[in-house]
Amino acid sequence: MSVIKMTDLDLAGKRVLIRADLNVPVKEGKVTSDARIRASLPTIEIALKQGARVMVTSHLGRPTEGEYNEEFSLLPVVDYLKEKLSSPVRLAKDYLDGVDVAEGELVVLENVRFNKGEKKDDEVLSKKYAALCDVFVMDAFGTAHRAQASTHGVGKFAPIACAGPLLSGELEALGKALSEPARPMVAIVGGSKVSTKLTVLDSLSKIADQLIVGGGIANTFVAAQGHNVGKSLYEADLIPEAKKLLETCDIPVPSDVRVASEFSETATATLKSVTAIKDEEQILDLGDVSAERLAEILKNAKTILWNGPVGVFEFPNFRKGTETIARAIAESDAFSIAGGGDTLAAIDLFGIADKISYISTGGGAFLEFVEGKKLPAVVMLEERAKQ
């Protein structure tokens, strides 16, 4: 994957526009989870230290496109950056016709979704973004799968388009895990529906030595083995697909589970064999035997790709399966890569972030990359590197 890297460029005195992923949760004007901003800080700091005229922009939330809405303003992000950086930081609301930036100053360009044509990758808007800079830095892996004006179009028209350190690191880590994995390679795919992850399961079944399924996805595989899954979340119409995958790939289907009579935080967890599930019960977590069996597999792995929890870990009574898996990954010597919102929440909950080799910042982009799809922003950077 050949792209120009920001770290290989001399940025002194240049107008540098960084497209970061600063789409963070905000409550009452304050950032409530700063993980994405923290991940973007090193890129901003490199450009500032080199004496560049730095602009950074992002989307935040889902405002009506083309309309200013204070609720989705990047102002809370600006306040956060002011606390973390020694350089001056300010917000620019109207910037499409040009913005003055001093060397060593950071100007945050207001939410790109306030601009008409952003999502449609409008050429006129893309050219306006491009005219703001000498160097465009794409550093938002989380939006690299979307062809939009601030992630894709701008890069076609900017004098130079390059990958920021966060995006470069993400592509290298995923490339390492998928193209030449150290073996055995184990992939974990959790989540509620097989339908949304079918392509991922299919792609991974071809490269993983073992494929661990969890959550609602695992319930469909339990049903595919002929067991009653009661009121559990599962997809009956995808049982043939699950059977096909069971024939072609080593998938350790749970042998015991934790069930409840209702989907609630206070529901009592009952441990039982998959052969004994009653009509009124629903599976909400793995059982101890199954979880330990998976932990053993993970301890012997050399590459682990983790996307999705294996149970309803948000409920304390149904957390044990995901925690057992998480701790096994943390203790493993494998190169481990984790991605997806629920997965990151589980990593935070169990405090194992420093034990995972690489944590991906992308949800949809992470899955599309794993599926083998081309990400529009990355394709654009590759094209520009050839010019």
UniProtKB/Swiss-Prot annotation:
GO biological process, one term: gluconeogenesis
Protein name per Swiss-Prot or TrEMBL: Phosphoglycerate kinase
Pathway(s) of this molecule: Carbohydrate degradation; glycolysis; pyruvate from D-glyceraldehyde 3-phosphate: step 2/5
UniProt xrefs under InterPro entries: Phosphoglycerate_kinase, Phosphoglycerate_kinase_CS, Phosphoglycerate_kinase_N, Phosphoglycerate_kinase_sf
Quaternary structure note: Monomer.
A Gene Ontology term for the protein's cellular component: cytosol
SUPFAM superfamilies reported for this sequence: Phosphoglycerate kinase (SSF53748)
Subcellular location: Cytoplasm
EC code: 2.7.2.3
Family affiliation: Belongs to the phosphoglycerate kinase family.
One Pfam entry name: PGK
Gene of this entry: pgk
Catalytic activity: (2R)-3-phosphoglycerate + ATP = (2R)-3-phospho-glyceroyl phosphate + ADP
Keyword list, A-Z: ATP-binding, Cytoplasm, Glycolysis, Kinase, Nucleotide-binding, Transferase
Residues at which ATP binds: 197, 314, 340-343
A GO term, aspect molecular function: phosphoglycerate kinase activity
Residues bound to substrate: 21-23, 36, 59-62, 113, 146
